[in-house]
Structures are given as structure tokens and as C-alpha cells.
Amino acid sequence: MDLISVLPSASKSCVCLHKPLSSSTHKLKPFCKTIRILGMPRRWKFAGPSMSLSTVASDDDIQRRTGGYHSNLWNDDVIQFLSTPYGELAYRERAERLIDEVRDIFSSMSLEDGEFSDLIQRLWMVDNVERLGIDRHFKNEIKSALDYVYSYWSEKGIGCGTKSIITNLNSTALGFRTLRLHGYPVSADVLKHFRNQIGQFVSCPSETEEDIRSMVNLYRASLIAFPGEEVMEEAERFSEKYLKETLQKIPDCSLSREIGDVLEHGWHTNLPRLEARNYIDVFGQDTKNMESNRKTEKLLELAKLEFNIFQSIQETELESLLRWWNDSGSPQITFTRHRHVEYYTLASCIAFEPQHSGFRLGFAKACHIITVLDDMYDLFGTVDELKLFTAAIKRWDPSATDCLPQYMKGIYMMVYNTVNEMSAEAQKAQGRDTLNYARQAWEDCLDSYMQEAKWIATGFLPTFEEYLENGKVSSAHRVSALQPMLTMDIPFPPHILKEVDFPSNLNDLACAMLRLRGDTRCYQADRARGEETSCISCYMKDNPGATEEDALNRLNVMISGVIKELNWELLKPDSGVPISSKKINFDITRAFHYGYKYRDGYSVSSVETKSFVMRTLLEPVPL
């Protein structure tokens, strides 16, 4: 009997609303070819159950597994006693004046047309307002500046100015990166013109600050690679090696710290608000030119004010999140991880425009619910209980709790109430009812959890391909993104939504990215908890003799390929879908990727993740 179709005998009204997973529409799209390339045979493997984990006896005398997770780091006292003065009117008025002054700086650049630095000056302004996190105020100015730069773009790149005789690596690398990220059709072949006669990138032996900065921008550009762009891979290897060697030679200064940040976070794990916080510390410290100093002072003051003013908004939102967490009964759910503040911080780092409060709170709530459900299906619930819960969710009726164990009743109502509330918010933003659409996404997610619970209970180990197909759904990327995304002031009509959400390649890749990266960070801890099934174990079973190191190497190759495909899905020209519509889903991928950068930062949030929360959420920037 198919596990997904099993219905509780207690209620004949519990009906299956969609197909069992074995016939799901969640197919492997970009990965079937990759799997064949990696030599992964398609066959079933069995393994005995592994439950080397501490258990606890519940009130019903059932021995239940526990994850041994640390408790919530951000209790009521921490949140309730936050206080910042930057919500006061005087700070907002000062920020508005600075915004006007920075607009004047953009406008003054048109007076320098035809000079020897007009192109690099425009790129410098655009790059810096973006890295400082203040670009939302200057959308028109940015477009005007980039249109001007692109009008002088050639297949060999650009120089510092329109009167420059030769092209320049720094201008070209920065221009290529910025133009590509804004959707201009620029070819990576432009970088080939900076290789020597035997096709290799070479560095200037003088190693001036300009030479070093050229390599910084070459490295940053190389990370925005599309599939098949070999020159970008060469540029990344060369510039990364150069910058690492340079760090060993130059003294500690703002440039060395900038290089360290760029190497540490790259682009795919460099969340916009985190980048702004780090860049504020190094921006303009070594500027010697008086005119440049005046520009940097205004940009820096505005960036600091904007960062701190947003924290006053976050305080209010955190209070709202804390009320929801308490009212939902979450503190009484003792078997799960409580990371709602960490999830809120991630959301704040990718969407920190004031009007996106619904997204930030919705993302934190959705991710908290996902975590509770994940821990319940993986650890705490029995298979029979989980069948009941899965069927109850498909009924979508509070009376469905009658057939649930006591500990599941509150969890069910948390899901039911929160999904309904987020659907109401989405209806206000999108002008249509999306509840049934969201329910289907949640049902698909729970079906995939149910499949994994069956594997855990029976000790069954699927093929890599089958595991990944199910794992893309159980990654829960889709349900974490869908409803929060629909609360934004970005239009998502049905024809656009299907290019961003399921069944789009963007959604498929985002889900795969989270599953692959998550498994490389979690598989050892999961195994200790009795969860044998992972990308690593399935790959090793499919490839007898392969070691864990072999499996990790293969997965890292796949992840690198997925990143390039994600870049393409976001930035490909003439897709008919605005970049702004795709970018929030793309940035959610970056947020999850950051959470797994050093370890499983969601299970163990007391180290790097805690520092991340402190730096971007709780600590103001000194003015």
C-alpha cells in the first residue's frame, strides 16, 4: 500500500487531494543529465535501520527520538528590551537630506561626459551604493548611469573613460559584473582580451592598489558565471589565488579587510544587508583624494543612518514575531529547534526595504513551521501518527484535530492559522485568492516528509536519483518562499508565478541547491540521530567503493553547477520575466546557502549564526 494514500480510519472525510509521490510531477529537470555524467547507476539499495540516538519516554509511554538541539537563544527579555533611538524623526530627516545630496552627486557626473574617468566614476557610484545597501533610493540614477556605460561597451571592454585609448581590466571587470547583474546582455568573452598570448591571465608585477583592486573586481565578476563559461572559471581560479597570496603580503588595512570579506563571502552567500554591514567598516578609509572624500563621507553617513533606522523597524517586527511565537503555542513544543529570530534575520538581510514587513515576518513564520514539522516527521512522530497528520492537513479543517494525538493538535492549528493568515495578506497584495495554491505546496512538502519518515522507519535507502527527487521537495524551499513572496508589492500574476515558483527551472534549482548543500553539512549529525538517508549515503550505495570524501567532492561539483544555472535563470536575457520578480526567490536560495556556509547553522545557531544575528539585527553601527 502506498504510504501517502493511507487515510485514518477515524474519519472517512479525510481524502487524498493529490497524487502519491511515486507519480508526482516533481521531476528531476537539470539533474538527470548531471547524474548520468557522474556515473550514478539507477538501482535500489537496502540498509538496516540505524537508531544510535538517545530516546525519551513521552506521556503515552512511546519511546521517541530527540535531536538534542540547543534551546532558543533569544528569549523574551532579549527582544523586549531592545531599544534604538534611530526611529526618531530627526534621523529620518537627515537621511532624506543625504539622499538628495547623493542624487546631486549622480547628476553632477553628466557634467564630466567625455572625460578620461567618466565610465569608472559611474561604475564606482553604482557599485558603492549597492554594496552599502542604499541603492533602493537611486533606481533611476543607477539605470541612467549604466545606460551610459553600456552605450560605450565593446567586445574588448571599456577604459576608465570615453576618451581612454585602451581598455582597462578594472573598468571592464567591474562594468561586466554590474551590467550583467542588471540584465544587460554582456558576454564573458570580453575577459579573454586580458589574457596573454598563451591564453593565461597575468598579473601586473607592480601590485599597486589599482592592480589589486582590478583583481578584486575580476574575482567578483567571475562569480556571476553562466554554465559553459570556461573563461569565468579560469578568471575565478586566477584571481582567487592572486588575492590569497596578496593577503599574505600587504599590511592590515581597509583594502586587506575588503579582500578578506570578498573571499569569505563571495557572492552567493553574501547577503545584501550583511555585505552592507561589512562594507561600512572598510569603505573610504584609505581615500586620499579630497573630492572622493566628500563623496564617500555622504555615502557612508547615509549608509550608517539607513542601517540603524531599519533596526527601529526590526524592533517592532520582532515584537510581533515574538507574540506570534508565544500565541501559536511554540514554547510548549519541546522536541524541536526554535530558530524564528534567526530566520527573521535572514529575511531582513535579503529584503530590508521598509514596505516588505509582510515578507520578513512571513518567511520567519513559515521557516519556523517547517522546522517544527521537519523535526516531528524525522524524529518525534511515529509513522502511524504522521499518516494521521498528513491526512488531516489535506482535510484543512480544524475538526481534523479530533483524530490527532494531543501533541499534534497545537502544531496542526499553528499551520492552519498561519497559512490562512499569510494567504489573506497575499490576497491584499496580489488581488486574488492563493490559499488553495499554497495548500497544495504544503501538502506536497508533507508528502515528501512522509516518504522520508517511511525510509527512516524501515531502514530503506533509495537510489541517489530517487532521493534527490523527493529531497528537492522536502528541502521545503518552495513553502518557505511562496507565501512570503506573494505578500510583497511585486506583481505575481499566474503567468509570472509559474516562471518563479513550481514548475519553473528556477524553483527546481533552488530546491536542489538547498537539498545538496544541506546534506553536505548535516549528514553526520543526521546519521547520529538515526537518519541514514542522505545524498552522501545514497551516492555511496550507488557507487560501491566510494568514500564519503568521494561523495562530497561529487556533490560540490554539482553545487557549483547549480549555482551557475541559478545565475542563468535569474539573469538570462529576453526571458519575459522581470529580474525583480525572480530575484527574491533567488535571494532566498542565497540566504539558506549562507546558513549552511560553515556548518548546519540552523541546528547549531550558537556560533557563526549567533554572531550574524548580533551584527546585522541587534548591534547598531557607530556613527
Curated annotation (Swiss-Prot):
Q: Which Pfam families match?
A: Terpene_synth (PF01397), Terpene_synth_C (PF03936)
What cofactor is needed? Mg(2+); Mn(2+)
Report which reactions are catalysed by this protein.
(2E)-geranyl diphosphate = (1S,5S)-alpha-pinene + diphosphate; (2E)-geranyl diphosphate = (1S,5S)-beta-pinene + diphosphate; (2E)-geranyl diphosphate = (-)-beta-phellandrene + diphosphate
Q: Where is this motif: DDXXD motif?
A: 374-378
- Read off the InterPro entries from this record: Isoprenoid_synthase_dom_sf, Terpene_cyclase-like_1_C, Terpene_cyclase_plant_C1, Terpene_synth_N, Terpene_synth_N_sf, Terpene_synthase-like, Terpene_synthase_metal-bd, Terpenoid_cyclase/PrenylTrfase
A cellular component term from Gene Ontology for this protein is:
chloroplast
Q: Which domain of life is it from?
A: Eukaryota
Which GO molecular function, any one, fits this protein according to its record? Answer: terpene synthase activity
Q: What is its main location?
A: plastid
Q: Where does Mg(2+) 2 bind?
A: 374, 378
- List its EC numbers: 4.2.3.119, 4.2.3.52, 4.2.3.120
Tell me the route in metabolism or biology where this protein functions. Answer: Terpene metabolism; oleoresin biosynthesis; Secondary metabolite biosynthesis; terpenoid biosynthesis
Binding-site residues for Mg(2+) 1, renumbered to this chain = 374, 378
Q: Where does Mg(2+) 3 bind?
A: 526
Per UniProt, subcellular location reads as:
Plastid, Chloroplast
User: Can you quote the record's cofactor note?
Assistant: Binds 3 Mg(2+) or Mn(2+) ions per subunit.
What residue stretch is labeled transit peptide in the record?
A: 1-52
Similarity remark: Belongs to the terpene synthase family. Tpsd subfamily.
The free-text domain note is: The Asp-Asp-Xaa-Xaa-Asp/Glu (DDXXD/E) motif is important for the catalytic activity, presumably through binding to Mg(2+).
The name under which this protein is listed is (-)-alpha-pinene synthase 1, chloroplastic
Q: Which organism is it from?
A: Pinus banksiana (Jack pine)
